[in-house]
Structure formats: structure tokens, C-alpha cells
Amino acid sequence: MNTSNRRMGLFYVITGATCWGIGGTVAKKLFQEYQIDVNWLVTTRLLTAGMLLLMLQLFRKDRSQVIEVWKHKASAGQLLIFGLLGMLAVQYTYMASIQHGNAAVATLLQYLSPVIVIIYTLLRKQTVLTKQDIITVVLALVGCFFLLTNGSMSQLSVPAAAVVWGVLSGFAAAFYTLYAVGLLNKFDSLVVVGWAMIIGGFALGFIHPPWQLDFQRLTAEAYAYILFVILFGTMIAFWFFIKSLESLSPKETSLLGSLEPLSAVVTTVVWLKAPFGSFQWIGAICIIGITLILALHKEPSMESEKSILKIRNHANRDI
């Protein structure tokens, strides 16, 4: 893996996580000011973003992959699993945790995913635990905690259902990151993410069809927010996150995903004029620290390269 590929991988995951966080803040404004249903927004953004990604693929040389992925039972089955247990599960479990509790707890529990990814790769003997792994995981958990709670434990007092959904969200995010690798070995990231979004959106559409909304009450501003959530908060965010796995290991990608709550909090402070506490500054420094550690990390050694290849080979066999 050369330095330029690694830099591009860092660019993709940082941009993707940032867009996801900003998109979450914009979505929050839609929920609060326009009373848009969560399930409607998730269904609509998945279906629309998925179709746009596949349309992009049709303008590329390897456009045949859009149909080719469905011609083989193995890849078709993998894509269905990824769309339902990966793409849809990440969205639904996270939203369910918010519904039963609050966004702080939901996000904190979802960011157990880097720990789950590292434990999985250790158990499969696909990597070794390093001092950097321990430092970055601690920084991710501490950083997210301070960012989302400002050091107040009162926000962590939620019903058991919120905790269960939050933990499931963490496992779903880990599965999403690990499972994608096998598909990326065979198909372009546009194809993988595009079809996964359509599968997830179609399944959720049975609960809340995208046409069930009072469109007349929406203003031009609301439509602009919805468009932003679809293009940047969904399409770019998920595509770039998955594409980064072509150049980075799953544990690096999942750790850098902690930029999502940082970008969400910063956007809330700057745009929605929310206060930013002293403990949140500590959290921000922790998250920035992760980015610097991984960005300044030298290009992987041959042993690291082999561990990444092992993950991909195991993923191919397991799925």
C-alpha cells in the first residue's frame, strides 16, 4: 500500500465521517422545525442516494457491474445481507436507540464499534494488539463521551431498551465495516453502497413509504435541507466511508469514524448556536488526537499489509 493510496483513504474516511455528522445536525433541524418523520427521512435518503450512486456508476467504464453483481448467487446473497444487516441495521438500530433514549447515549454506544472490530480481528488472529490501538480506542471512547455529554452523567440515565438498541447499533456498525471488505474485492464501492442503500431503503419503505408525507407544508428551505441530507449526509458520507476500506484497515476506518460526533457538535455550535462546554473541548482534542495519530502513522509494514489481506480473505470465505 503506497503513501498516496493511504492519504486518499484518510481523505475519504475523514470527509465521509464529517459529512455524516453535519448531515445529522441538518436532519435534527428537519425533525424539530418541520416535524419530518425519522423513518420517512431514512427511507427517502437511502433510496434516492442509492439510485444516484448507481447512476454515477453507469457513466463509468465498468458500468456492467451494476447488473453483474446480481448474476452470481454468492455476490447477490452477500449484497442482500450487507444491505439488510449492514446498511439498514446501522440506520434503524441507531434511530431506535435515540427514540427510546437520547442521541448522546445512542452515539456513544454505536462507537463501541472500533472496539468490536479490534476484538474480532484479534480473535481471528488477523492482527495483533498494539499500543496505538489501545491509545486510539481510549481516545475515541473518552472523546465521544465528553463531546456528547459535556461530562454530565445525567444524560446517560436512559431506559434499558435504549441501551440494548445502542449496543446492537455498535455491532451493526462493526459488521458494516468488516463485511464490506469482501464485496469491495469484487465490485466497485459505488455498486456496493448504491445497491445496499436501495435494499435497505426498500425494506424500510414497508414501514414508512416515501410518498406518505404532506409535501405542501414544506418550504424551499426544507427541501434544501433534505437535498443536503441525501447528497452529503448519505450519498457522500457512506460512499466515502466504504471506499476508504480500499486503502485503510477496518480498525483505522472505524476509529476515524469518531470524527462524526465531532463534526455534528461543531456544526450544532456554529449553525444552531448551541453552547460548547469545557469538557466538550477535551472531547474535541481527543478526537483530533486520533486523526493526527493515524494520519502521521507511517505506511503499514509488510506484517500490517498481510493482516489486512487476511481480513479480506477471511471475509471472502465467511460471506
Curated annotation (Swiss-Prot):
GO terms for cellular component: membrane; plasma membrane. It is found in: Cell membrane. Keywords: Cell membrane, Membrane, Repeat, Transmembrane, Transmembrane helix, Transport. The chain crosses the membrane at residues 8-28, 36-56, 79-99, 103-123, 134-154, 163-183, 187-207, 222-242, 255-275, 276-296. The lineage of its organism: Bacteria, Bacillati, Bacillota, Bacilli, Bacillales. Residues 18-149, 171-296 form the EamA domain. It is a multi-pass membrane protein. It comes from Bacillus subtilis (strain 168). This is Uncharacterized transporter YdeD. It holds the Pfam family EamA. It comes from the Bacteria. Belongs to the EamA transporter family. The keyword Signal does not apply. The gene is ydeD. PANTHER family: EAMA DOMAIN-CONTAINING PROTEIN, INNER MEMBRANE TRANSPORTER. InterPro entries: AA-Vitamin_Transporters (IPR050638), EamA_dom (IPR000620).
